[in-house]
């Protein structure tokens, strides 16, 4: 397979995932066959303290600083779950993103599906415990993470071409908003529905085909 130029692929993990997720390890191994491609799986939560305090705006700005620090160009993004929200807003705010492959993306801030009573309790106590899968334990999150998230309640237009792969049985991030988003921005967004729940790890081979054909424009 041939690639016409050097490229950068950034993987943005989900809210309670990490840069060492199943997807990150899978793509890192697959992309070893493409020396023209720089692969970066950014870890937004290197420690529980980072997870406790980091906001959506903070993650977007952290991604910007990472891109500048590493002088990255020809960027495409794989955004998984919450990473999809970060990808869309980063591209909209800063530009420089050629394509986005979004995997069961959160297109808006979802407040984890908490009830009004649960949100009120979170505000009252100032922090609430959330299970972080990568750390394997509950970690408190400050309420101002929720306050910041309220800035991201409406979907934004895509700044570059997007393919969304989403499971029809996803209960964590339901597929219906992705259907609406793809219909609203049909010129830029293509939705691929699969029989899967949220993590999509049973469909990594399919996702990899779109990494090659869509993000890399690989010629066979």
What are the roles of these predicted feature ranges?
Residues 51-69:
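Alpha/beta-hydrolase active-site loop
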Residues 21-25, 57, 175-179:
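Short, surface-exposed alpha-helical segments at coil->helix boundaries
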């Amino acid at each position: 397979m041939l690639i016409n130029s050097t490229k950068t692929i950034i993987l943005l993990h989900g809210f309670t995932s990490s840069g060492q997720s199943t997807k990150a390890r899978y793509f890192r191994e697959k992309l070893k066959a493409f020396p023209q491609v720089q692969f970066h799986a950014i870890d937004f939560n290197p420690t529980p303290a980072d997870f406790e305090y980091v906001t959506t705006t903070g993650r977007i700005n952290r991604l910007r600083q990472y891109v500048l620090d590493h002088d990255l160009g020809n960027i495409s993004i794989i955004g998984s779950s919450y990473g999809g929200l970060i990808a869309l807003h980063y591209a909209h705010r800063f530009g420089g993103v050629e394509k986005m492959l979004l995997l069961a993306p959160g297109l808006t801030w979802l407040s984890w599906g908490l009830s009004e009573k649960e949100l009120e309790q979170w505000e009252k106590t100032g922090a609430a415990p959330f299970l972080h899968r990568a750390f394997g334990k509950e970690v408190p999150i400050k309420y101002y993470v929720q306050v910041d998230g309220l800035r991201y309640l409406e979907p934004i237009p895509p700044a570059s071409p997007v393919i969304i792969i989403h499971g029809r049985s996803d209960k964590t991030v339901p597929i219906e908003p992705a259907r609406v988003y793809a219909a609203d921005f049909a010129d830029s967004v293509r939705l691929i529905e699969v029989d899967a729940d949220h993590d999509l790890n049973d469909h990594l081979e399919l996702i990899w085909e779109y990494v090659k054909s869509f993000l890399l424009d690989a010629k066979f």
